[in-house]
UniProtKB/Swiss-Prot annotation:
GO terms for biological process: chromosome condensation; sperm DNA condensation. It is found in: Nucleus; Chromosome. Testis. It comes from the Eukaryota. Its main location: nucleus. Belongs to the protamine P1 family. This is Sperm protamine P1. Keywords: Chromosome, Developmental protein, Differentiation, DNA condensation, DNA-binding, Nucleosome core, Nucleus, Spermatogenesis. One of its GO terms (molecular function) is DNA binding. One of its GO terms (cellular component) is nucleosome. The gene is PRM1. Coiled coil: none annotated. Residues 1-63 are annotated as: Disordered. Protamines substitute for histones in the chromatin of sperm during the haploid phase of spermatogenesis. They compact sperm DNA into a highly condensed, stable and inactive complex.
Length: 63
């Protein structure tokens, strides 16, 4: 039991840190765009232009 607990703890900690960073960055970006209507309109147009594969690849590399 002790060994299992230690292992899960270390794993969860590393995962939690990574998830926390990603979430905070996304949340901040959403807030800024939501406040101004101009930004939201621009973002919608850009998203439609980009292909899904390209967008996902860029997101993965950045974060």
């Amino acid at each position: 039991m002790a060994r299992y607990r230690r292992h899960s703890r270390s794993r969860s900690r590393s995962r939690y840190r990574r998830r926390r960073r990603r979430r905070s960055r996304h949340h901040n970006r959403r807030r800024t765009y939501r406040r101004s209507r101009r930004h939201s309109r621009r973002r919608r147009r850009r998203r439609r232009g980009y292909s899904r594969r390209r967008y996902s690849r860029r997101g993965r590399r950045r974060y």
